[in-house]
Amino acid sequence: MAEEDAEKAFFQAQTMNAESVDYKAVEEHGADSSDSDDYDPSKTLQDQYSSSMTDLKQSENVSSSASPEPNPTEQNSVQPDHDPSQPDGASYPSQTPPRDESRTSTMVPTSGTSVQPKTRTIGGFVVEDEDEDDAGDADYEPPAVLGVEDMNTVATNVPQQSVSGNENEASSTPDVSLDDAAQQSASLNNVSHNSYSPAPAVAPKSDVAVAAGQSLYNSHALQSGNVQDSATATPTPDSPSTSKGRLPHDRVGILEDRIQEDPRGDIPAWLELINEHRSRNRFDSARDVFERFLKVFPFAAEQWVAYAKMESELNDLYRLEQIFNRTLLTIPDVQLWSVYLDYVRRRNPLTTDTTGQARRIISSAYELAFQHIGVDKDSGSIWSDYVQFIKSGPGNVGGSGWQDQQKMDLLRKAYQKAICVPTQAVNTLWKEYDQFEMGLNKLTGRKFLQEQSPAYMTARSSYTELQNITRDLIRTTLPRLPPVPGSDGDIEFTQQVDIWKRWIKWEKGDPLVLKEEDPAAFKGRVVYVYKQALMALRFLPEMWFDAAEFCFLNDLESEGNEFLKQGMEANPESCLLAFKRADRLEITSESEQDPIKRGAKVREPYDKLLDALYDLIAKARTREAQDVARLEETFAKMNADNPPAKTDDDDDDQSESKARESVKNAQIDAVRKAHAIQIGILSKTISFAWIALMRAMRRIQGKGKPGETPGSRQVFADARKRGRITSDVYIASALIEYHCYKDPAATKIFERGAKLFPDDENFALEYLKHLIDINDIINARAVFEMTVRKLASNPDNVHKTKPIFAFLHEYESRYGDLVQVINLENRMRELFPEDPTLEQFAHRYSAPTFDPTAVRPIISPSQMRPKAVFPTSEQPMSRHGTPTPRYPGSVTDSPKRPLEDFDDDYNRPRKFVRAESPLKTSQRRQLDQQKRSQLSNVQTGSQFRSQGSPAPLPRDIVHLLSIIPPASAYTAGRFSPEKLVDLIRRIEMPSSISQIPLPQSARGLGTTQTPMQPFSGKASPSLSVRAVY
């Protein structure tokens, strides 16, 4: 059957090719008019091409209207949406048709039947005809590149290869679904590459720009731009859309299915599909994929650059100019502007410029570029190119002619602008500027350099700081959806977001000192960084919100509204952006007298948000069905491959089948529960979006009147009609009716909600609060009993009754009867036995900020006695800032080697007793003099010290003295030693203390120690000495 279908498709393609190609008409278009050499590409930025863009959009809609079908071999015809009678040249009514389009205008089939791909069969499978793909490779000539050489060499006598080009386009291989043939036939009116030489067999490596930021994606997802890499199959997700109806070698169909399933998340599929079409020289299909990709990612500058380079290589200058018109003024990207500047210099060669018109055009293009990307930290190369461009102009620097003076002024102006911008070339440009000024006149040069030096120093230091901030930044324009916390790539994504935020914060800190001198430049730099960040963080609503908020706070109303508009287009499901946009519209439309018009304007963001959220729920339902179908298919295949072993015992066979069935059901239940959680979150989000819209309409239109103004009641009715709402919508509507209008409809709404949400404890709690607010205690108790009994009847819902019990218990404790309170506590104790009784009892008398039952008043000062701190041997306390006490050594030191000074006795090295070394006469005299001075100091320092050498203090006392903080640490009252001594005198000590022997460690080294005597009211000398110390 497959062979018959393939043969039928082959003969149909042959018939269509023979009928649709008019060779005579192709030859007659060989002498078409050439392009004008006086064309000014810089002026195209101001043109809108309204009519041509409309026709282009129509052709794009035709090419994108076809959707992939499950079976690529079943299709009879595709009817294009455009009128076949309309000539192709009408696509650009305001412009002269380019040569390539005029040559292909006669090739459009007159019938709506699509050209079937030329195929053949091998072994019963449909395969591609490699001979057709390789046709014309020997005659291939590389297209012109963007540059300054050979800029007027756009050939006017290009060989007519449109027929072969169409054959190459039509003879598509079977790995392209038949929708691609429909797209090709529908887009033939825009064919422009066929008039060029035979298309290359291998696309250049710069086909699709692959940013450094692609490491954020899966490792298997993004390959290099080389076509050889694109020939390798990329692992695709196992889904029914790709596993059914697609042959394994149908790469285009598989990639289309991946894009259709996840257009915003599967960027690698987009890039591979573009490479696939370009590698097969299907440039119309590649254009179609580019356009679809850029509708989803309109600020992906890397792909705009790849798109522009493709058109440049094909010499399709009109399409290239259209790309520049669509991107340059809205996408501030250095690489994109570099491509534009190269194109301008290509179309305006300086070698043949006798009038100076080309130089003026190029100069105006540079000025326009600096207005949009001149502040970029990577724009140093463009500044350097501009300086070199000025140097190449007529005139000599330092001459006396008017051209010389003009060149000197232009160079000085360019240098002074460039050295103020923190770029990678700021140091090089400053050195060149220094040589330039000093080469003209040293006196005036020093003056100019001195004036510009502060700006240069600021720019240089700022660039260093900026490089430190952005060292790990991956500056890509291919945005990624934020990973869910805990999933793959969330840490890397968070790091990138933090770097962007630090960059923005750095710009807001005004490091270039522009806020006071040039506030417009300061705001422009911050907005520029926001735009750069939003290229990479397109799907992060918080960043759009911050950018818009900055604009609103700095009188940039139009920029802020544009940020919100673009943010909502990128994130239609973001409540943050929709609410902010609605608030701005509500504030700015206060002058509108008609509440209906004002309400319609404010409601627009809410409607878009709700549509996106409902669409997400539909997709979640579809994904759930696909996951369940995949599980069932997997288990069915497993049962078919490994059926249960047949045994004599039927019970064993049934038990094995039941086990497999139970495993399948468990997995299906897990999948459904996971999707139910996601759908529940979406339903909650939808409900709060309706609530926000309801409150906004209440502010603008009130509660509404039937037939006149919708108001909040109409929003409530719309929410109920559309469904997927939670009890929060009923609660909000009822409370609006009560608090704003005191309308009895609030109670009716609660009654209606109680029937719809009988198991919702939050709704029951709000219902109780409302009934108590209106002083309807009888109905409140009735609702309480009804709700509690219904929830308690199900053991799984018992925990839901706790907040309801707690609320009524609090109310009864304050305003009810004690018997009711005790009964409630008994019921709570039965339902929640794990809760302590003390907590329930204390709840009666406590408030959210104070619990009197937990207070312990201070009755005696003994309750506030501080704890004694005892240092442990494992971790001695720190003594930083405390002076270490020094005591006169009792052992004679040798002047030849002083005794080691230890702060304490811990870990003191063990010493061996050695004989004293003999001292010389001078050393002995010095030692005797030192002893006499120490003795006199001790005797004069304290009148309480006894004669003779004092005994060393015990180790514990030394340690205690060492850990006492210094006097400066005491900020309260000072320590009074007199009062301490007086306290010690009044202490009554037992008379038997003299019987206690002294510990061995407390005994002195001498024999003059006397036993301790009973306290007689007089302080002993040793005690007095220690107290004074």
From Swiss-Prot:
Q: What is this protein called?
A: mRNA 3'-end-processing protein rna14
**One Pfam family it belongs to:** Suf
Q: Where is the composition biased (Acidic residues)?
A: 127-140
Location in the cell: Nucleus; Cytoplasm
Instruction: Respond yes or no to whether keyword Cytoplasm is given for this record.
Output: yes
Primary localization: nucleus
Which source organism does the UniProt entry give? Aspergillus fumigatus (strain ATCC MYA-4609 / CBS 101355 / FGSC A1100 / Af293) (Neosartorya fumigata)
Residue spans of biased composition, Polar residues class: 43-79, 104-119, 153-175, 932-949, 1006-1023
Which SUPFAM superfamilies does the record associate with it?
TPR-like
Q: What is this protein's function?
A: Component of the cleavage factor IA (CFIA) complex, which is involved in the endonucleolytic cleavage during polyadenylation-dependent pre-mRNA 3'-end formation.
The Low complexity compositionally biased stretches are: 229-243
Is NADP among the key words of this record? no
In the record, biological process GO terms are: mRNA 3'-end processing; RNA 3'-end processing
**Under the GO molecular function aspect, what terms does this record hold?**
mRNA binding
Quote the cellular component terms of the Gene Ontology held in the record: cytoplasm; nucleus
Keyword entries, A-Z = Cytoplasm, mRNA processing, Nucleus, Repeat
Matches recorded under PROSITE patterns: TPR_REGION
